[in-house]
UniProtKB/Swiss-Prot annotation:
The modification N-acetylalanine is found at residue 2. The lineage of its organism: Eukaryota, Metazoa, Chordata, Craniata, Vertebrata. Its EC number is 2.3.2.27. Atypical E3 ubiquitin-protein ligase which ubiquitinates TLR2 at 'Lys-754' leading to its degradation by the proteasome. Plays a role in regulating inflammatory cytokine release and gram-positive bacterial clearance by functioning, in part, through the ubiquitination and degradation of TLR2. Inhibitor of protein phosphatase 1. Residues 90-99 are annotated as: Atypical RING finger domain 2. The keyword Ribosomal protein does not apply. One of its GO terms (cellular component) is cytoplasm. This is E3 ubiquitin-protein ligase PPP1R11.
Length: 131
C-alpha cells in the first residue's frame, strides 16, 4: 500500500528585526579622576639576628615557633593594632609548641610507676624540622 500526502501541512514563519542606533554628541565636561597610590607592603620573611643559636650545629637557624600566624583582620583594620587575643593558636596540626606568649606547655613528667605513653601520631617525630 502506498500512502498519499494528505494531511501534511507546512508552516513558514518570517521575522523582521529593525535596529535603530541613536548617537548623542555632547561636549566633554571638565572631569577629573583621582587615583591614590599606595606603597606595596614588603613580603614577610624571617630574619635571624646575630645572637640566634645554631640549630644542633647543622648550620640552620631556629625560631621559637614553627609557623608565622597572622590573625585575620576586617577590611580596613590597621595591621599595627594589637590585642590581647594574640595568644590564640594557629591551629596547624604540625605546630608542636603552640602560640602562647611567654608560656611553655606544661606536660607532666612520666613517673617511674607510669609506663611511657606511645607518641601521638598527629605530632611530628622529634628531630630537625623539615618543611
Amino acid at each position: 500500500m502506498a500512502e498519499t500526502g494528505a494531511g501534511i501541512s507546512e508552516t513558514v514563519t518570517e521575522t523582521t528585526v529593525t535596529e535603530t542606533t541613536v548617537t548623542e554628541t555632547t561636549e566633554p565636561e571638565n572631569q577629573s579622576l583621582i587615583m591614590k597610590l599606595r606603597k606595596r607592603k614588603p613580603e614577610k620573611k624571617v630574619e635571624w639576628s646575630s645572637d640566634t643559636v645554631d640549630n644542633e650545629h647543622m648550620g640552620r637557624r631556629s625560631s621559637k615557633c614553627c609557623c608565622i600566624y597572622e590573625k585575620p583582620r576586617a577590611f580596613g583594620e590597621s595591621s599595627t593594632e594589637s590585642d590581647e587575643d594574640e595568644e590564640e593558636g594557629c591551629s596547624h596540626k604540625h605546630c608542636v609548641r603552640g602560640h602562647r606568649k611567654g608560656r611553655r606547655p606544661t606536660t607532666p613528667a612520666p613517673t617511674p610507676t607510669t609506663p611511657p605513653q606511645p607518641p601521638d601520631p598527629s605530632q611530628p617525630p622529634p628531630g630537625p624540622m623539615q618543611h
